């Protein structure tokens, strides 16, 4: 679990161009597609229930994001997720806004129960709510959690048998046994809508080329954070930062990860 390992995964993405099937939200769908392209993978954004089984069968990872939820979309997620499980395609779930409304919380829990999720990625509030901790969410924003987020993530991951990612100033990645802390990133990333969704897309791209999803998730977050740091150095505000972030991901080299990844083992 060294930066060299993370860099090798980036090289595998660029060489293999894995197909990442998204069922995601209307607010950030274009950003998710573009961030997937910039890292070197291929996005497809299909969510019609009539076609998702066929599409996911040819994919290398499936990213589910409940940001703009509907009953039809949840049905499509179930169809796609079951096919992904049958085809051994890793599933990444981003439970956007879980804890804000009962529908979001129930839908996220149902997907966790019905599917084998490889990676659950959310903020501390979303993950805390799903783990049964005392957490507060307003809209899609995290307000607070009454417990240590590392302990919450670790216990939840071990109990559910999944990799849990909590995004924040320091990202937490754990499977219940191992805990990695990723310190890369910049505060400007929190001032731009959709960076959490983009992180889930990158988690899908890296999961597509790795069996160890603790390593792949940490690699995705380190790569995203390094690109964010580089973007902040040249941006004058949130929207120029957005453009620089995409440019930074597209220009990211394996050596940038080797030299720039700041990851700690807890």
Name the predicted role of every residue range.
Residues 2-13, 162-184, 256-258:
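Acidic-glycine-rich active-site phosphate/pyrophosphate-binding loop
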Residues 21-34, 46-58:
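N-terminal glycine-rich anion-binding loops that anchor highly charged ligand groups
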Residues 65, 73-122:
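Glycine/small-residue-rich loop that forms an oxyanion/phosphate-binding "nest" at active or ligand-binding sites
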Residues 104-179:
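Conserved phosphate/ATP/ADP-binding segment of small-molecule kinases
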Residues 150, 154, 180-193:
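Short pre-catalytic strand/loop immediately N-terminal to key active-site residues, enriched for Gly-Thr
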Residues 186-203, 213, 238:
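Short glycine/threonine-rich catalytic loop with a Thr-x-Gly-x-Asp
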Residues 203-242:
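Conserved post-catalytic alpha-helical subdomain immediately downstream of the catalytic base
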Residues 226-266:
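Charged C-terminal helix
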């Amino acid at each position: 679990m060294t930066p060299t390992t993370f860099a090798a995964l980036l090289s595998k993405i660029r060489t293999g161009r894995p197909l990442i099937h998204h069922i995601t939200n209307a607010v950030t769908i274009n950003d998710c597609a573009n961030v997937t392209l910039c890292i070197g993978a291929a996005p497809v954004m299909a969510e019609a229930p009539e076609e998702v089984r066929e599409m996911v069968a040819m994919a290398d990872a499936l990213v589910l994001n409940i940001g703009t939820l509907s009953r039809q979309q949840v049905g499509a997620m179930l169809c796609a997720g079951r096919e992904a499980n049958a085809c051994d395609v890793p599933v990444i779930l981003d439970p956007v806004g879980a804890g804000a409304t009962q529908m979001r919380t129930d839908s996220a829990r149902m997907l966790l129960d019905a599917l084998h999720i490889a990676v659950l990625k959310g903020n501390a509030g979303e993950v805390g709510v799903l783990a049964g901790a005392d957490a507060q969410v307003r809209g899609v924003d995290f307000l607070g959690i009454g417990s240590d987020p590392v302990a919450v993530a670790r216990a939840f991951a071990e109990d559910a048998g999944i990799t849990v990612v909590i995004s924040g100033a320091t990202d937490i990645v754990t499977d219940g046994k191992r805990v990695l802390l990723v310190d890369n990133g910049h505060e400007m990333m929190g001032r731009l809508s959709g960076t959490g969704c983009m992180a889930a897309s990158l988690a899908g791209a890296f999961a597509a080329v790795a069996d160890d999803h603790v390593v792949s998730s940490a690699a995705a977050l380190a790569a995203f954070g390094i690109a964010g740091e580089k973007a902040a150095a040249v941006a004058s505000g949130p929207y120029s930062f957005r453009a620089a972030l995409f440019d930074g991901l597209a220009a990211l080299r394996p050596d940038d990860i080797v030299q720039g990844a700041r990851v700690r083992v807890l």
